[in-house]
């Protein structure tokens, strides 16, 4: 099946009413875990790297590890996605490396922290759309603004998406998928009070726009993982995420792409802490990264089943980026 445009994966999900997880990666073990889970459940998958991950691992190193995931899993539809690109240059770099999808987050200025205005968002998004579509690459953008800060991205303040503005934004930019803000946030501390999402906003946006909708900040922060982290020496009091039933309701109401990063970090960290606590003599990285990889595979497989992605890997004939170039450049 190999590398496919994210647009195809999300449109198939929209047609059949399921969600697709987009799982953030920083290293080999995370990529292997995600792909093993995709094979186990026969799920299409989006593997995504943030600018922070690409800086940490080096753009080329991480990019080629992601390509290895495609090569080693020919029966699985895989999209390679840039998460929270901040400029046309960041998108170009990902496209040049072979990514099949890029996100441009024009809801913030190029520093990834300062809130932008509508005009700025439209201009930077349109420039990325015009460039990416020449290469058959999918473009995701964001309207509204999530709270929280993760991987150096975020202003800390939230701004719920205005449905009419979302409609105009899609018309003004020609973007392929739209991330909206309905009350989720980045990081492990998503709610200060009641866990409330603006499902009414999601429903209104879904009525107005026809393209796939994306939900960022969608980790569930399972209590058992927080308890395990804290049991083995961590300090994460009060961490809370989005309940799975909320995510499943969002999928039913029209979300196709669900971003997951924090949960993967927690699964690996809890396992590594456990290994070092119970076996302090261990020093071979394989002795702690191996169990962490297994734990993450289990977590991702459970999400693929809960999102409804499982069993859909063989549903459709894959499109190539060359195919998409013809679609975009008619």
Describe each PLM feature range.
Residues 4-12, 28-53, 59-75, 84-212, ...:
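Alpha/beta enzyme core
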């Amino acid at each position: 099946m190999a590398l496919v445009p994210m647009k195809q994966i999300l449109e198939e999900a929209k047609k059949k009413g399921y969600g697709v997880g987009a799982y953030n990666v920083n290293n080999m073990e995370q990529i292997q875990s995600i792909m093993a889970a995709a094979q186990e459940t026969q799920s299409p998958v989006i593997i995504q790297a943030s600018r922070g991950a690409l800086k940490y691992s080096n753009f080329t190193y991480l990019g080629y590890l992601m390509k290895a995931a495609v090569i080693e899993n020919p029966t699985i539809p895989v999209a390679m996605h840039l998460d929270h690109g901040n400029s046309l240059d960041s998108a170009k770099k990902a496209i040049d490396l072979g990514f099949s999808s890029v996100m441009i987050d024009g809801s913030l200025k190029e520093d990834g922290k300062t809130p932008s205005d509508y005009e700025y968002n439209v201009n930077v998004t349109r420039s990325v759309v015009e460039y990416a579509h020449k290469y058959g690459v999918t473009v995701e953008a964001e309207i509204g603004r999530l709270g929280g800060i993760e991987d150096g991205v975020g202003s800390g303040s939230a701004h719920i998406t205005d449905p009419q503005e979302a409609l105009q934004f899609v018309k003004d930019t020609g973007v392929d998928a739209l991330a909206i803000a309905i009350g989720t946030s980045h990081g492990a501390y998503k709610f200060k009070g009641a866990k409330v999402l603006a499902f009414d906003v999601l429903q209104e946006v879904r009525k107005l726009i026809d393209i796939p909708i994306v939900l960022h900040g969608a980790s569930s922060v399972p209590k058992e993982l927080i308890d395990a982290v804290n049991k083995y020496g961590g300090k994460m009091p009060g961490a809370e995420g989005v309940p799975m039933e909320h995510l499943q309701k969002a999928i039913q109401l029209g979300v196709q792409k669900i971003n997951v990063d924090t949960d993967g970090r927690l699964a690996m960290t809890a396992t590594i802490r456990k290994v070092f606590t119970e076996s302090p003599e261990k020093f071979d990285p394989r002795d702690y990264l191996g169990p962490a990889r297994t734990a993450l595979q289990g977590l991702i497989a459970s999400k693929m089943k809960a999102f409804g992605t499982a069993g859909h890997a063989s549903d459709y004939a894959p499109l190539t980026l060359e195919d998409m170039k013809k679609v975009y450049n008619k």
